[in-house]
Amino acid sequence: MGKILVTGGCGYIGSHTIVELIQLGYEVVCIDDLSNSDGSAIAGIESITGVKVKNTKISVGDSVALQTFFKEEGPIEAVIHFAAFKAVNESVTFPLKYYQNNLASLLVLIETMKSYHCNNLIFSSSVNN
């Protein structure tokens, strides 16, 4: 089985997805800028699965860091993308922040995937009122 990148993997949904992927036999790598989490989920994943998962603290919108990550970790077979802001009230107050993080960074991710011939993307989003 191939290597899967989970963005936002230190969050609730991302960390649970990583556990499932490991249990299915995938090698998983994670990136999370820790803006909405503290990274403690990584220890929980290891406790549950017995597998040490590497989290690299970078933003999906940082093109240079993302390119470096793909180069060092590749080949990556697929990306499951959870790295997005989700608070509706905050998005109304700070729309540019949400645009940059949720849309512009997604475009950086897609361009990087294209450069490294990673053609499989699962995009998921949740919301918090």
Walk through the language-model features, giving the residues of each.
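N-terminal Rossmann-like NAD(P)+-binding domain of SDR-like oxidoreductases, especially those catalyzing
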Residues: 1-129
